[in-house]
């Protein structure tokens, strides 16, 4: 059985505190990796926290079961259940925000995450693993993988990946979509 959404929210809120404790280091990493001015890197962190708070605040409502109108002889209901392993493939240009969208939504929904960050900003993925991969009560929720598009395609071909969230280039998208289609 998966923990209730309310418990996931609290566990993930605690995990996100890593980003606050490491705020200046993360901003400096973004600046070093991308050449962004430090002020812009700090602003991305501000946006990151706003987005995270929105996802945390809306999770219980968004993931609540939905009862649909009755049809004679049927009780209809939509339940949001975890898929399993979600492979989040993230772009480089907003290394925190783009990753957060897929990572936090997947974790809130009760999934585990394999994160492949863009090679240009791969060290940012280490911060996600430090925050979400080492939660004492839920170890291994997130693993950061260093992988080429080809390697990512090979991972997708395997049945251990249950869902893929991709943000990136057209070339990367093509490399990722071919193996996904071959799974059927």
For each predicted feature, which ranges?
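Rossmann-like NAD(P) dinucleotide-binding subdomain of oxidoreductase/dehydrogenase enzymes
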Residues: 66-184
């Amino acid at each position: 059985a998966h923990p209730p959404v309310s418990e996931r929210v609290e566990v993930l809120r605690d995990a996100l505190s890593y980003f606050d404790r490491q705020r200046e280091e993360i901003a400096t990493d973004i600046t070093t990796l991308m050449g962004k001015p430090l002020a812009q890197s700090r602003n991305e962190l501000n946006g990151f926290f706003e987005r995270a708070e929105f996802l945390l605040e809306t999770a219980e409502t968004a993931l609540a079961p939905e009862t649909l109108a009755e049809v004679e002889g049927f009780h209809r209901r939509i339940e949001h259940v975890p898929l399993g392993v979600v492979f989040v493939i993230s772009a480089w240009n907003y290394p925190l925000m783009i990753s957060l969208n897929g990572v936090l939504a997947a974790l809130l929904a009760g999934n585990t995450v394999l994160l492949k960050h863009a090679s240009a900003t791969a060290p940012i993925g280490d911060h996600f693993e430090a925050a979400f991969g080492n939660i004492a009560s839920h170890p291994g929720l997130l693993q950061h993988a260093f992988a080429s598009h080809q390697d990512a395609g090979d991972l997708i071909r395997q049945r251990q990946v249950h869902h893929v969230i991709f943000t990136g280039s057209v070339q990367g998208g093509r490399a990722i979509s071919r193996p996904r289609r071959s799974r059927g």
